[in-house]
């Protein structure tokens, strides 16, 4: 429940099929928010829109950009105000088809210990470290697999640097307790 309730308030709507729903639970505590640097990983040109989370992902061209910017500032200038900073809509109690979970008080959401994306990023990072700060074709394919799943653009003509991989870790694992 913490990951769902702490990152939402009653003004956030993560489900376009049910505009009255917030996060699929009956709790929205309005606490944790994204730092500007994280949001800008999805908008490197700095032009970050103030949209609902599902629309932000579409604007970023990356399904992982689940940030609510409606009536919020990008910067976290006042840490005691939830509208100071973008809300994070990464975790919900909605099923993949958009329907609600079984219980709004006790979420159905499972918490993962290891994801395929972690293995792919570990492989790509090791590949780049072995090959002078640039992925080979195999390392590039590993990152492209993650980005294709997120409907984000991929690279075919050149590989990824360690800096690119670090940014990819951020985009994939934010709010999951993993390193950047």
In which residue ranges do the predicted regions lie?
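Extended, hydrophobic/aromatic-rich amphipathic alpha-helical segments that build helical scaffolds
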Residues: 1-2, 62, 110-146, 162-176
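C-terminal capping/lid segments that line or modulate ligand- or cofactor-binding pockets
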Residues: 5-8, 151-158, 166-180
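Surface-exposed charge patches in extracellular/virion surface proteins
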Residues: 64, 72, 83, 95, ...
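Elongated scaffold/linker segments in the mid-to-C-terminal portions of large proteins
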Residues: 1-122, 127-129
